[in-house]
Amino acid sequence: MTLRPVFIFDLDGTLVDSVYEHVLAWQEALDAEGIELSVWRIHRKIGMSGGLFTNQLLRETKVDITEDRVERLRHLHAKAYQRLSGKIRPLPGARELLQSLTNASIPWAIATSGRMETAAHNLAVLGVDV
């Protein structure tokens, strides 16, 4: 049996320079809900799944995070992120790396803890079909 290499890449902060747009979008969403949390605390949570993010948010702010509020926050984040996403670019060499792997018939995939409503733009910036 021959082992073949396979690559799985994270999207935000690995292939595209989008971390700060996520941070600013979450800050805007939290501000709209009256939840105070400093930017550096939000930055520490980027990459967490939605459930873990909201659990950490509850722990740090002592604010009740209901299902309705989670949905509002997600919607507000996505809306702010879409507005900020025009500045997002692939990180240097990311497109070329994916193309080189494709040309060499080496399978690769992209993973993200984000939702498609924000990830779709980043994938398009990379030239990846969804």
Each predicted region: which residue ranges?
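Generic non-transmembrane alpha-helical segments
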Residues: 25-33, 73-83
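Conserved H-loop
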Residues: 36, 64, 128-130
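Histidine/lysine/aspartate-rich catalytic loop segments that bind and position anionic ligands
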Residues: 113, 124-129
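A metal-dependent, Asp-based hydrolase signature
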Residues: 47-80, 92-95, 100-102
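A short, structured active-site edge motif that brings together acidic residues
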Residues: 41-46, 69-71, 128-130
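An amphipathic alpha-helix signature
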Residues: 23, 27, 50-55, 116, ...
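Active-site neighborhood of HAD-like aspartate-dependent phosphohydrolases
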Residues: 2-43
